[in-house]
Regions:
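Structural core segment of the AMP-binding/adenylate-forming
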Residues: 73-74, 101-197, 514
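AMP-dependent adenylate-forming
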Residues: 7-13, 18, 33-56, 74
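Conserved adenylate-forming
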Residues: 71-76, 202-214, 219-262, 282-284
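Gly/Ser/Thr-rich phosphate-binding loop
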Residues: 306-311, 320-381, 394, 404
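Conserved ATP/PPi-binding loop(s) of AMP-dependent carboxylate-activating enzymes
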Residues: 388-392, 403-436, 474
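Conserved AMP-binding/adenylation subdomain of ANL enzymes
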Residues: 240-259, 267-308, 322-323
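Conserved AMP-binding/adenylate-forming core of the ANL superfamily
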Residues: 25-27, 44-89, 93-97, 114-119
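AMP-binding/adenylate-forming catalytic core of the ANL superfamily
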Residues: 113, 120, 130-132, 419, ...
Length: 567
């Protein structure tokens, strides 16, 4: 074992693209400071585009101030947690920055979560206020009294559509009714607080106290390295630092001229940082999509061609196929950054042939706001690796059994990360915080890596037993507990199996109770009522028993080996 950190010399700096600094400046502004600077500098420029409707930075700033005042009238004060349960839409962006302007804390949620999943998170963070898509209003309204927020604001995202599209949705025809049902719903409550009423008042008084860089900005729920969902605490300084690191990483960005495509969900740390903070810090136009759809992207590209597209490999593959078929022109895309799951070299080749631009892989985790490493934007990038540490970011590679001990150069070990983007711990989880956040500010990644002599990092294994599917983390334990609730299931183990495109699927091995029989489709339907769709096992195998250790723990690696033999 090494006696000290072999990576202190930062040999990877030689691989940085020209103009990329080794360090970023000290963070001195909060996220509200950042967006206000963009409003001042790029006031007339487009900030958001949604189904063709464009919002300028000046109008965005005005809406943020009015929404902040509306939230203040509802009783939101600094330090309050405010839950957001919204798809990608302009109201999501406004709500995010309005909450932060008051010094309150944003808590992001997946609007496609089941009531059970949402309730678990609300029980943990105890938000007094929620701003929710009107289609999930009733879910939150039905929470037990001790969990339900005091105030729930209903958002009809179709109010942000252009006039012509709103009119089309009101047509008394089946197609319009079906489209409307997917996008909006009327809450059962007689007089819910509407988003429109929240933003129709005056602007927030300038004297209203402002948050500081060290204040908590966000609770972002993650399975972490242990599989149990918990809120990662991220400050204004953490999130602003990561936006600054992203800006420094990409040479040739044109302030006020780039067009980012928001195909990633803003409730995910990756989509949030790339499109809500990084993009808006440079005055970019952010084209928002409530869900990824090739035809929607194709239509938008005809009016506002994308120049910067953060996404995940399955999205790049779908768009590359569409380009090859002639249904979309991607040649405007200069920069594409992939994350959240491994990036196959074949995906890179197809994408770069379709666009003429670069597709590079980055690496991070919710606990690092989320980006910590990336491939250089230039000839020194290396497909198949996750690149090198970002500016102001340090790494260690340690013995996973004793993270105080560094491994020898080139040997595999657990990746540790330190930098201004590293989180502050988990909400109300001191034990798990201490396990993940080590002395000196190092965060454990749970990933086993090797580091090449020139500093490029390759992931070779995963300590944490999370499954990454479509860019989302799935806790095997959560899925196993759901399966075990079925009356015919005696035991279950959940693992990842490989997909042909290099990604992973959720697979389950189940042991039935004596005399029981079960239809796999029925079991998956059972899960679908309790879990978000991406967590539902794609493959289910009925087995006689599960391999266990001497102390009775299921050996998931052995389960995976068995299933690979049967798949």
């Amino acid at each position: 074992m090494a006696t000290s950190n072999p990576h202190e010399s930062k040999v990877w700096l030689a691989a940085y693209a020209p103009g990329v600094p080794s360090e970023i400046d000290e963070v001195v502004e909060t996220l509200p400071d950042m967006i206000e600077a963009s409003v001042k500098t790029h006031g007339k420029a487009p900030a958001l585009e949604f189904f063709g409707a464009v919002t300028s930075y000046r109008d965005l700033g005005d809406q943020i101030e009015r929404a902040a005042e509306g939230l203040c009238r509802l009783g939101v004060v600094a330090g309050d947690r405010v839950a957001l349960i919204l798809p990608n839409c302009p109201q999501h962006v406004v709500a995010f920055y309005a909450v932060l302007r008051l010094g309150a804390i944003v808590v992001e949620h997946n609007p496609l979560y089941t009531p059970r999943e949402l309730r678990h998170q609300f029980e943990d963070h105890e938000a007094r206020f929620a701003i929710v898509w009107d289609k999930v209003y009733d879910v939150v309204d039905d929470f037990p009294q001790d969990v339900r927020p005091e105030q729930i604001v209903a958002v009809d995202m179709t109010e942000a559509f252009p006039w012509s599209k709103r009119v089309a949705l009101r047509l008394p025809v089946a197609k319009a009714r079906a489209a409307r049902a997917k996008l909006t719903a009327k809450p059962r409550a007689k007089h819910p607080v509407s988003w429109a009423s929240l933003v129709e008042g005056r602007r927030l008084p300038r004297r209203t106290p402002r948050p500081s860089v060290d204040d908590i900005a966000l609770l972002q729920y993650t399975s972490g390295t242990t599989g149990s969902p918990k809120g990662a605490i991220l400050t204004h300084g953490n999130l602003r630092a990561n936006a600054m690191q992203g800006r420094a990483w990409v040479p040739g960005l044109r302030e006020g001229e780039e067009t980012f495509y928001g195909v990633l969900p803003l409730f995910h740390a990756y989509g949030m940082t790339l499109c809500l903070t990084f993009a808006m810090s440079i005055g970019a136009r952010v084209v928002l999509f409530p869900t990824f759809d090739v035809s929607l992207v194709s239509d938008a590209a005809k009016k506002s061609p994308p120049t910067f597209l953060p996404a995940v490999p399955p999205i790049y593959d779908q768009l590359s196929r569409a380009s090859a078929q002639g249904s979309i022109d991607l040649t405007s895309v200069r920069f594409a950054i992939s994350g959240a799951m491994s990036l196959p070299v074949a995906t890179v080749e197809r994408w770069e042939e379709a666009t003429g631009g670069l597709l590079v892989e980055g690496y991070g985790m919710t606990e690092t706001s989320p980006v910590a490493l990336g491939n250089p934007i230039g000839p020194s990038r290396r497909p198949g690796t996750v690149g090198v540490p970002f500016p102001s970011t340090e790494i260690r590679v340690v013995d996973p059994e004793d993270p105080s001990v560094d491994v020898e150069p080139g040997e595999p070990g657990e990746l540790l990360i330190r930098g201004p983007q590293v989180f502050q711990g988990y909400w109300r989880r001191p034990g798990e915080s201490a396990d993940s956040l080590l002395e000196g500010g190092w965060v454990r990644s749970g990933d086993i890596v090797t580091v090449a002599p020139d500093g490029f990092v390759t992931i070779v294994d995963r300590l944490k037993e999370l499954i990454i599917t479509g860019g989302f983390n799935v806790s095997p334990t959560e899925v196993e507990e759901t399966l075990q609730q079925h009356p015919d299931v005696a035991d279950a183990a959940v693992v990842a199996l490989p997909r042909r495109d290099g990604g992973e699927i959720v697979a389950a091995a189940v042991v039935l109770r004596p005399g029981a029989t079960i239809d796999v489709t029925t079991l998956r339907d059972f899960c679908r009522t309790r879990l978000a769709a991406y967590k539902v096992p794609k493959r289910v195998f009925v087995v006689e028993d599960l391999p266990r250790s001497l102390i009775g723990k299921v050996l998931r690696r052995e389960v995976r080996t068995r299933l690979l033999g049967e798949a």
